From Swiss-Prot:
Source organism, top-level taxon: Eukaryota
Subcellular location as annotated: Cell membrane
Tissues/organs with expression: Expressed mainly in the brain, with prominent expression in the SCN (at protein level).
UniProt name for this protein: G-protein coupled receptor 176
Region (Disordered): 407-435
Cytoplasmic side of membrane: 65-77, 130-157, 226-264, 323-515
GO terms, biological process: adenylate cyclase-inhibiting G protein-coupled receptor signaling pathway; circadian behavior; G protein-coupled receptor signaling pathway
Annotated source species: Mus musculus
Extracellular face of the membrane: 1-41, 99-108, 178-204, 286-301
Length: 515
């Protein structure tokens, strides 16, 4: 990627006061030099924007193809191949041309012959892969439209086609090591200062541009024309095919769906932008190779450097904007990132210790728990009958005492300290006395959930309370008032005997016999 003598104006001497004609010529030369320097700064700025935008855009294309299943696996593979070649071309081609465009005499290590040849080889490879990916996508679109119910290109064939693309690019780029002053589409700098006018150089330039640039672009337009003819013929004949690819309600569908039509428009736009941006490159090749013009204009050279690189930025932008499904996926991802970032800001800016009077969802600081709690309140909202039973429940103190007994699990029941109870004679109180789980006051309870041993989203719904057990509106059978009683189900006893009382107050045990 050596120094190109045409980048620097040869007229760099200061004007002399020899004559008026020479002074005018020197002033005009300085004016041209200042314009060239200004245009050089413009090209450097544009290439920096292209470098950043192409990297971000191609990475987003890779992410969208991996995240969504909008297209088939074969189409996704070709699109990923195009995005990878765009990333490689942006990383390898653009930075060094930015350096040489800003200052041709900087970075002496770039001008070493070995380093320059390796970079030119990589430039050729990635440029060739980008161009050869267009006909591969067009071929896949052609088979998808003409044979929608068949799979002409399998996954194995698509992998082989991608391997052929890279092999073709490598073989077409190997002669760069022998011909050092070759310029490609994405990098116009050369490794030698003087252009060689040998026959081998002319043959290589013609063969490369015909086989790697002109023929692939012509194949793309040929496939697009065939697709258009097939679609127009299907619309005229009103062909109705089974809705296997895009199901609809018994409506005649064309060969290509809206999603495929968007992909066709994307491919056509990419190829059109590539052709328009490559016009300065083709002009420069004709000037330096065919017409053998050694001194070309600085403006033509700088334009041939930055304008073809616009296609590196245009390819991902067109893919992300023209396709509606990909655009929706991208917008949804941005919305998710915004929500996640805003949620983190709310949690980080909140106080470390919450007030005890706040709700559990607000104390936790999690929006997920808050949404769950609100949804639970809406689901288990008490009805009018339940509100009446709640009023009766709050007005009866005896009923509250019974509710305390029934709300505690077995083995943990303790009668309320309302009055000392005396056990009947001849009985032994074998149940252990355990203090309740939560201290309870003898006053009126604040709400109907105060007797339940739950917290937050684990509070029991009103349909499971004892006053509504006989109602038809309950959701589940009354297995208990606490989660422990819900889990502990009683196993029915087998071969239970019957006890009958006789006239002499004697208990007789009769075994139960199956009749």
């Amino acid at each position: 990627m050596g120094h190109n003598s045409s980048w620097v104006s040869p007229n760099t001497s200061h004007p002399r006061n020899t004559s008026g004609a020479e002074a005018g010529a020197n002033l005009s030369a300085f004016g041209e030099l200042s314009e060239a320097q200004l245009y050089r700064q413009f090209t450097t700025t544009v290439q920096v924007v292209i470098f950043i935008g192409s990297l971000l855009g191609n990475f987003m294309v890779l992410w969208s193809t991996c995240r969504t299943t909008v297209f088939k696996s074969v189409t996704n593979r070709f699109i990923k191949n195009l995005a990878c070649s765009g990333i490689c071309a942006s990383v390898v081609c653009v930075p060094f041309d930015i350096i040489l465009s800003s200052s041709p005499h900087c970075c002496w290590w770039i001008y070493t012959m070995l380093f320059c040849k390796v970079l030119k080889f990589l430039h050729k490879v990635f440029c060739s892969v980008t161009v050869l990916s267009f006909p591969a996508i067009a071929l896949d679109r052609y088979y998808s439209v003409l044979y929608p119910l068949e799979r002409k290109i399998s996954d194995a064939k698509s992998r082989e086609l991608v391997m052929y693309i890279w092999a073709h690019a490598v073989v077409a780029s190997v002669p760069v090591f022998a011909v050092t002053n070759v310029a490609d589409i994405y990098a116009m700098s050369t490794c030698t200062e003087v252009w060689s006018n040998s026959l081998g150089h002319l043959v290589y330039v013609l063969i490369y541009n015909v086989t790697t640039v002109i023929v692939p672009v012509a194949v793309v337009f040929l496939f697009l024309i065939l697709i258009r003819r097939a679609l127009s013929a299907s619309q005229k004949k009103k062909v109705i095919i089974a809705a296997l690819r895009t199901p609809q309600n018994t409506i005649s569908i064309p060969y290509a769906s809206q999603r495929e039509a968007e992909l066709h428009a994307t491919l056509l736009s990419m190829v059109t932008v590539f052709i328009l941006c490559s016009v300065p490159y083709a002009t420069l090749v004709v000037y330096q190779t065919v017409l053998n013009v050694p001194n070309t204009s600085v403006f033509l050279l700088l334009t041939a450097i930055w304008l073809p690189k616009v296609s590196l930025l245009a390819n991902p932008v067109l893919f992300l904007t023209v396709n509606k499904s990909v655009r929706k996926c991208l917008v949804g991802t941005l919305v998710q990132l915004h929500h996640r970032y805003s949620r983190r800001n709310v949690v980080s800016t909140g106080s470390g210790v919450a007030e005890p009077s706040l709700e559990p969802s607000m104390r936790s600081g999690s929006q997920l728990l808050e949404m769950f709690h609100i949804g639970q309140q809406q689901i288990f909202k008490p009805s009018e009958d339940e509100e009446e039973s709640e009023a009766k429940y709050l007005g009866s103190a005896d009923f509250q005492a019974k509710e305390v007994l029934t709300s505690c699990p077995e083995g943990e029941q303790e009668p309320p300290q309302l009055a000392p109870s005396v056990p009947p004679p001849g009985t032994v109180d074998s149940e252990p006395r355990v203090s309740p789980v939560a201290p309870m006051e003898s006053g009126i309870f604040p709400d109907k959930y105060s007797l339940q041993f739950g917290f937050g989203p684990f509070e029991l719904p009103p349909q499971w309370l004892s006053e509504t057990r006989n109602s038809k509106k309950r959701l589940l059978p009354p297995l208990g008032n606490t989660p422990e009683e819900l889990i502990q189900t009683k196993v029915p006893r087998v071969n239970r005997v019957e006890r009958k009382m006789s006239r002499n107050n004697k208990v007789s045990i009769f075994p139960k016999v199956d009749s």
